[in-house]
Each structure stands twice: as structure tokens, then as C-alpha cells.
Amino acid sequence: MRSASPLAPAELRGNRLWMRNYAISLRSWHNRKKLLREGGYTMKQEKAYYHLPGLFEFYELYREFLPLFRTHREYFYDWCDIGSIYGAPADCVWGGGRAGFGEHDPKEVLALTREYGISARLTFSNSLLREEHLSDKKCNALCALFERENPVQSGVIVHSELLLDYLKTHYPQLYFVSSTTKVLTEFQQLRAETAREEFRYVVPDFRLNKAFGELDSLLQAQKDKVEFLCNECCWVGCRDRKRCYENVSRKNLGEACPEHICTAPGAEEGYRFSKAMENPGFIGIRDIQDVYMPMGFSNFKIEGRGLGSALVLEFLLYYMTKPEYQLHVREAIYLDNMLDLF
């Protein structure tokens, strides 16, 4: 059966930004199908690496999940692995993206990632930092600890150029990730960002996820840096995304500011994975295997720091766990014969 070309949702056809990227995607659709059939993508990746949310926030979940991932590898897809776990403790001035709420001892967190050979990332993506914030004792202590005590290199997700320059000077053993909070919606922005030597990874705005023609024009070294945000639930026509992130940055700085009110359709429902799956920018496991890996991409970010651990577990089940073993994982982590929901 022939695959149908992707259709633009009717409610988005007036949004110029999304329609531009949609047009690029549509133009490349048939060429991409032809290349896949003919084996035209010569840099096919053999392994996808997931960058998972909640280093501090979901420590208890990972303390149960990671031993299972190691001892029962047959439960999980052999084409994927864990590239990193990212997050930030509560009350970090440098924090951004989401307000951190993790309370676990950073040494315990690092001990867990060290035991399983996983890179730990600090989410320090505040976009509004000033010179006086660079001396923050808590954030500096975290960077020093992460640079010193993890044999697998640790990283920092960063937005501020001021902070990036500071970290490069004071913590040169850390690697750096360009944050999705920059809201890179223009492909030339992404191309330029991936050309920067200081960034090992770059997370573009999710609205570039399906710009296949342009994405495939990147050099392989640039493709290796691109880290796609897979499960975003934000409305694809949103024009307030950067302001939303700035609101979080102000809160982390302790500034008095009004709550950002999301005006997107269905915003009152909050995050729903089923809704995210309907997002035109959603990247599912078939997309990863059949499109992105054959094109030469291998890094995929799962969002979820501000959600509950039950939903994050569902992400781990969907993206990493074979369907026939998903119940096994639930039973190993929380499900027993006496659990009541109501």
C-alpha cells in the first residue's frame, strides 16, 4: 500500500511559520520515500540515543528503571539506548525551561548515573542571566561536582551566551547543549547553531522536526549534533513559546512576575501524551526507525521534567520497551495485585 503524503491540519493552514516548514516537508516527502526504497541514505545510524527528563526530579523512578534496563535488556528495543538524563534541583538561579523541583542529593544522583555509565546533564537554560548571577554558589558547586565526579562526561544545557562563556572558562571538562528554549524555528538558525564548535548537541524547536529536505542537507557532523524534541504538546501555531520560557527564567531568578497564561487551543487540559501524538511535530518510534535513523540522525530528547513520574514511565514504555514486555516493566516498578486506583 502506498503511503499518503502528510496533510496540513485545517486549523494551521493560516499559520505562516508552520506552513512554510510543512511545505518543505511536503516537497521532500516523495524524494525521501524514494531514497528510503533505494537505500539512498548512506549514513544510516544503527542506534538511537534518548535524552531523558528528570535527573533530580525523577530519581526514584530511575533508581527502579535502570537496574531493569540492565538486567532485562530483552524487554527493550535493541536499536535504542540512553544517551543522558537531564534536569536541575529546585531553586537553581541558572535553571530554565521548567521550574526544577528535584530535592535529591546531587551526589546520590551522580552515583546512580555513574553506576550505569550514563551522562548526566544540568539544565541551566535561564535566558535572562546577568553578570551578578554567575557567582551563584549552588550552581557553581553543582558544575564543579558534575565535572569532577562522573567518569562519563557530564553536560550542561544552556541558553545564555554569558553563562556559556563563563562555563567554558571555569568548567572546561563539561560539554554543552544548545537549549530548545532558544526557539530556533528558522532552519538557517539551526544550521548556524550546529556549526558552532562549543556545542556538542543542539535542540531545535519542534516545528523543524519535519523539515526533512533541509534537515537532510546538513553535513553528517551537524546531523550528529541535532537532538530532536520528540513529544512536545505545545500548539504548533504558538507564538508565545519564547515568552513562556522567559517567564520561567524570571521565576528562577526570584523576580516578581505574573503567571504566563497559555492561550493555545485546549491549554486547559494540560499535557496529554495522546494529544502530543497528534501534534504535527511528534516523532514516534516508527519515525525514528524508518526516517530519522536512515537519514543519519541519532539523538532524541524526551520532555517531561514538569510532569508526573507515571507519565514519564509511559514515555519510557512507549519509546524504549517492546509492547510484549510493557506489563512486565509496570509490574517491576509499581504494579502489584493489591494496588487500588480508587
Residue ranges and their predicted role:
Residues 44-193, 198-342:
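Active-site pocket-lining/capping segments in soluble small-molecule metabolic enzymes
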Residues 14, 39-40:
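Residue-identity detector for glycine
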Residues 3-5:
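Short linear segments in intrinsically disordered or otherwise low-structure-confidence regions
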Residues 12, 35:
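Cationic, low-complexity basic patches in intrinsically disordered or flexible, solvent-exposed regions
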Residues 7-10:
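N-terminal secretion targeting segments of exported proteins
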